[in-house]
Amino acid sequence: MSSTPVVTPDITGTLPGAVVPLATAGSSDYTPTGVRFDVSIGGVPFMLTAGKDTPYVRQTAPIQKPQFDVSSQAGEQTLDQYWIRSQASWHRGAGVKFYEPGNSTNARLWEPGAELITEHRFESSCGVDVWTRDQATLLYRTALTGASAGLAYVTTGKLADGTDCVFTNEAGVINRRTAAGASTSYTGGTAPLTAIAVAGSKVLAGHAAGIDVGDANGSTMAALWTIASGATVVPYWVKGRIIASIGPSLYSLTLTPGGAIASTNIIHTHQDPSWVWSSVTDGPAAIYAAGYSGASSSIYKFTLQDATTGTLPTLGQAYEVAVMPTGEQVTALRSYLGGYLGLGTNMGVRVALMDTNGNINYGPLVVETAYPVYSVEGHGSFIYAAVQEGIDGLTGVVRVNLGQPLPHEDLRFAYATDAQTHDNGVPSSIAFFGTTDRVVLGVTGKGVYTQSATLLEATGYILSGRIRYKTVEKKAFRLADLRARVPAGTVALSALDENASEVNLITLGSNAADGTSIGLTQPAGNHEYLSFRTTLTCSGDGLTGPTLQSLQVKALPAPKRQRLIQYPLNCEDRETSATGVKFGFKGYAWQRIQAMELAEENNVVLQCQDFTNGETFSATIEQSEFARTAPRAADGSGNFAGTLKVTLRKLA
């Protein structure tokens, strides 16, 4: 162990470096020597000169910055110091984990750190219609109207004798179901049936022996085309003709009875004998057929070519216009609105664009699913997809809004869950009652579910994205404002913490609809983020429900508080300690000032020791200020002297 140098009280010259260390300020401790210093900052020692004009100060570091409101949502930065997050519309759909809205239309107002595509979005929903701007209401409920133990296939609805209806295959029996609830069963068909299709005034049904046909307004089926046993025929009606898939081959047929389907009717046979044609649809310039084999899947187009006047155009050869990522299989196709193509796959839903040449460009997965999507349909400005166990683990429908593309995201659109069966099972097909927007869903082994025209879902919810105000620092969530119209039923608000623990905050009813200034005493403590679930419940008769208008959450930042400590330090070339020991040399004060300024400029983490109270901690220099109070010595020996105020931010 090294010995401590002996220092006599009357030394007036330069002292050894061991007594007055001048190393660069850093993280090392200062080892006391013969001089009893008061403070060491980064290993550089000082004497305190605390007094009335130069006090020693300890204070809490500020945690909020001055700000003014330039947000796209008025009041998002407020004068009462609350951090606010507001949501008054949900029309951009589900799928966000964090709700950090920016400004999607004006880049000048884009909030740093915000995600433009989260504005007016939420994490998930169930049983709620979010597509009307500035409100959310309950959807109409569905009910099982045709129980079936076998395949339940629903084809696109139409008007039959002026009545909205759909055609269903319920365990091998063709039924025509009307929006009013009436049902007509067809006789004479060949079972077991596969898919059915509507061809103008005719209804087509495929089976293992060919294709049957019946009048849309009738009740009997008869053979249209036949095949030898050993295959299954699936018919599609596109561009005024029947396209039928049989194994790896596609056939072009007419509505005129033609007897046995022959090889002359083939328009394309895939070279892979295990190829499965999963869907056929038509676009403005071509017919599209999708299929798969193993991990490979593609979409082919057949362009229309001029034929003899008065006859249908002929079909050109098959061109592969889209190849899916390895492992993703196209299981459903539906063209819509002349330019869009809805793709159902074993991984979810995509949207593609068709050009005037019949080529397509598909986008990313809009909706991701755990099971294949076997049916896609269009209605209004929406594409509907049947999803298995996709609504809180149960089967139903997801709706994609083609009129609401997400900002800065090519071919990604707003989506949300829609009609639900409240049961599980494999959905085989989706349709609508004629010209209405009432969903009809076929579920294999369960039957046909139809959406009511008057009865609302008993309950539904919207789960917000996680609100964290664009920072992972802890927040103290203080207040919530819930606005809703509640003529009947209730609106309840609950909060979920980082562990998904949920606590109810308030329930609004028709007699107690004031949801302003809800105290957020739960979940207890400070949090990085909270999510909020708003649950809507309809009246007992199911005819009236509440309307959600807005939700606003207020919080304050709650990081670990830091301490600012201001030390008034004596800084002279030559000083005298409290015990009378003289120390220093010419340039000693200037070297210590430079050491502090260098540490401040480089934001060095310093080890600080206060020998007056025994405190040791890590810190950075927040501010330094030197005031010279002595003139230069007449003999030129220096006398650089004054008070150095150093403000430290305590880190630990």
Residue ranges of predicted features:
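N-terminal beta-propeller domains
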Residues: 2-185, 200-202, 206-218, 241, ...
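Non-cytosolic beta-sandwich-type ligand-binding/adhesion modules
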Residues: 5-9, 15, 20-24, 28-29, ...
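Extracellular/virion structural assembly segments
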Residues: 556-652
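Beta-propeller fold detector
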Residues: 184-188, 222-227, 261-269, 310-322, ...
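Repeated scaffold domains used in trafficking and secretory/extracellular systems
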Residues: 147-160, 189-201, 226-240, 269-284, ...
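Extracellular ectodomain segments of secreted/surface proteins
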Residues: 143-156, 195, 456-475, 554-558, ...
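Blade-level signature of beta-propeller repeat domains, shared across WD40, Kelch, NHL, RCC1
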Residues: 425-463
